[in-house]
């Protein structure tokens, strides 16, 4: 039985009645060959799962998609792929871990290739990057025309692994196969933008908006792309267009708030964040928005109010069991803490949030990715404060992590920390090589520019500073490192250096 195709790019879900059987045995050969099978005993579960993918992946209604996945596993508690999808997409660490475990518990109910998809979803969250890529490659080889699979794969490669060229190649190939598969158009624009080719994204956004004029996400994505390009008025226009189409499209509401924050209108940003917080029922999302709300006080150089706000949000995150968010809060406070010893204490608190007594709520991948960011910040702060023992100890911890965890966040954090240590030791050439391995992180870019300056690479240092200054996103590292870069460039423009430069 096929679920309703709400959009022309929907994958076909195959279900069984009574005893579970492999989906490919219950479906026509053409369907089985074109898309990864989906096995469930419940028509209600199958329809809810399909609607979860429609809302979460295709229309980008995140909260609604999660709710459909929850309905799917409620209708069929042994629906392995349903559990895997809920665990994969959930921002609640406990829910993600619990659902991942249930997916493995019932994985025998799934078809063999469906099991590969479950393993890919789980492995991405468990820090098993090599295994995840292996499963993904097998699936892409077996299902070259499964559009949603290819789109999800490319999204993960670009957004989580920094494998931009690989993700772009998958999407370009997919759009040649079906130029009207608009989720791929959307993701290709993001891949270009994240890969430093944002100028290639607006034409794709024009296609996306024209193709789906009554959907809010095309306007929302266009808004985010323009924000990444630093065109804040255009970003606000597109976000507001999305809200005119659907006032409940909360991603655009938080987009408006973050755009005001980046423009420096923190009072208006805080008011808009509060609207966004009220617009979601997901507790983890509410806390994420509260973190952005608290960050506005740091942006306007009110550190006391910022710390008070973050401590209040930390209490809420702790009560909700959101350990990753707790760690992120302490990491933010550390970066903006002018006292190095106190900042390192903040990072000790962040590590404690992820400690053995608390990590039971976390999947290993979530824990190690956040821990890598904490240790990277620790190395950065220690080097800037001249605390070499702390810097060396931190670099060693990351080196040990990097030997067993091949995820991009862990690997990049290690190279960044090693680069910071080499910089402190006066090995500027070595520092440059290591810091260039982490080209998207504002902390690494800040130190890379300094290392290039020390090495006499003045033109390269300025180019790196310009790259850093142009970053326009919501990360705490950007809020910390990008404004000084912009000030430095502004100072250079008004006080040009006399004489030549390389």
Residue ranges of predicted features:
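Position-specific recognition of the canonical hydrophobic site in helix A of tetratricopeptide repeat
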Residues: 56-57, 91, 124, 158-159, ...
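Structural marker of alpha-solenoid helical repeat scaffolds
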Residues: 75, 106-109, 142-143, 176-178, ...
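Residue-level recognition of tetratricopeptide repeat
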Residues: 44, 78-79, 146-147, 181, ...
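Canonical tetratricopeptide repeat
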Residues: 85, 152-153, 187, 221, ...
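Alpha-helical segment of the N-proximal tetratricopeptide repeat
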Residues: 41-71, 75, 115-134, 152, ...
């Amino acid at each position: 039985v096929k679920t309703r195709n709400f959009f022309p790019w929907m994958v076909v879900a195959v279900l069984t009645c009574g005893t579970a059987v492999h989906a490919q045995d219950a479906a026509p050969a053409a369907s089985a060959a074109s898309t990864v099978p989906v096995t469930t005993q419940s028509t209600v579960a199958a329809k809810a799962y399909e609607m979860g993918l429609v809302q979460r992946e295709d229309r980008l209604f995140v909260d609604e998609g999660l709710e459909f996945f929850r309905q799917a596993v409620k209708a069929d508690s042994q629906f392995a792929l349903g559990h895997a999808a809920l665990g994969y997409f959930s921002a609640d660490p406990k829910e993600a871990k619990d659902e991942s475990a249930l997916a493995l518990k019932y994985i025998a109910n799934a078809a063999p290739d469906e099991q590969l998809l479950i393993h890919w979803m789980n492995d991405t969250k468990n820090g098993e990057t090599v295994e995840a890529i292996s499963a993904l490659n097998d699936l892409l080889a077996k299902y070259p025309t499964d559009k949603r699979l290819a789109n999800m794969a490319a999204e993960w490669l670009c957004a989580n692994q920094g494998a931009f060229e690989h993700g772009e190649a998958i999407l370009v190939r997919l759009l040649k196969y079906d130029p009207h598969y608009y989720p791929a158009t959307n993701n290709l624009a993001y891949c270009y933008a994240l890969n430093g080719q944002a100028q290639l994204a607006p034409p794709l956004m024009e296609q996306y908006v024209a193709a789906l004029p009554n959907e809010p996400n095309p306007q929302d994505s266009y808004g985010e792309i323009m924000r990444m390009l630093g065109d804040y008025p255009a970003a606000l226009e597109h976000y507001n267009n999305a809200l005119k189409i659907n006032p409940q499209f909360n991603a655009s509401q938080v987009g408006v708030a973050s755009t005001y924050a980046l423009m420096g209108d923190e009072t208006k940003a805080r008011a808009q964040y509060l609207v966004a917080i009220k617009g979601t029922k997901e507790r983890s999302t509410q806390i994420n928005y509260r973190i952005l709300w608290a960050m506005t006080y740091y942006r306007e150089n009110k550190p006391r109010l910022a710390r008070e706000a973050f401590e209040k949000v930390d209490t809420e995150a702790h009560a909700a069991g959101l350990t990753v968010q707790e760690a992120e809060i302490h990491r933010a406070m550390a970066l903006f803490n002018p006292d190095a010893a106190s900042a390192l204490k903040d990072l000790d608190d962040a590590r404690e949030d992820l400690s053995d007594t608390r990590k039971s709520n976390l999947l290993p991948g979530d824990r190690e990715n956040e821990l890598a960011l904490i240790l990277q910040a620790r190395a950065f702060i220690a080097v800037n404060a001249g605390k070499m023992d702390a810097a060396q100890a931190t670099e060693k911890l990351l080196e040990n992590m990097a030997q067993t965890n091949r995820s991009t966040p862990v690997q990049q954090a290690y190279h960044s920390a090693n680069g910071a240590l080499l910089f402190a030791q006066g090995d500027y050439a070595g520092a440059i090589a290591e810091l260039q391995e982490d080209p998207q992180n504002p902390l690494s870019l800040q130190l890379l520019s300094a290392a290039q300056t020390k090495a006499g690479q003045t033109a390269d240092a300025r180019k790196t500073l310009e790259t850093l200054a142009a970053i326009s996103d919501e990360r705490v590292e950007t809020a910390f490192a990008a404004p000084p870069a912009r000030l430095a460039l502004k100072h250079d423009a008004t006080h040009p250096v006399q004489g030549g430069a390389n």
